Design a protein with these regions (language model features):
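Glycine-rich ThDP/TPP pyrophosphate-binding loop and its adjacent helix/strand module
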Residues: 1-85
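Conserved acidic/glycine
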Residues: 48-144
Length: 144
């Protein structure tokens, strides 16, 4: 199965590459796109969904990657991490959406714990993705 996680506002080239690869793959393909919607309560407004997607990727909330099994046939690592190391503030990203910001008003004592856990989980995912992307760069010795 070909799998990609994309965000149009974050990297249009990565999105187009993923769609092209997904279409070319001779089997099922799954492309998961980050799509801000009105229920997110983007404080900048719905006219800023592309910018919000970029913020999600820059903060490490959403990671961009592609998994193309065809690369394995070429002796290459099938997993490609397209996201850079997160550089923006994770909590600042969360607070830019009403769905998260409202939690600080309704359950302030729990909100901070949940935000910290969400950030830790996102960082763990990124580290796992980095490890997967590095796997193909290490030569593997064939057993005799």
């Amino acid at each position: 199965v070909y799998v990609a996680q994309v965000g149009m506002g974050a990297d249009k080239n990565q999105l187009m590459k993923a769609l092209k690869e997904a279409e070319a793959y001779k089997g099922p393909s799954l492309v998961i796109a980050y799509a801000p919607c009105i229920a997110h309560g983007i404080q900048a407004g719905m006219g800023k969904t592309q910018e919000q997607t970029k913020k999600a990727v820059d903060a490490g909330y959403w990671h961009l990657y592609r998994y193309n099994p065809d690369l394995e046939l070429e002796g290459k690592n099938p997993f490609i991490l397209d996201s850079k190391e997160p550089k923006a503030d994770f909590k600042e990203y969360l607070m830019s959406e009403v769905r998260y910001a409202s939690l600080t008003k309704t359950f302030p004592e729990v909100a901070e714990q949940l935000f910290e856990k969400a950030e830790m989980d996102a960082k763990k995912r990124y580290e796992i993705y980095k490890q997967l992307a590095e796997m193909g760069k290490q030569p593997v010795k064939a057993e005799a």
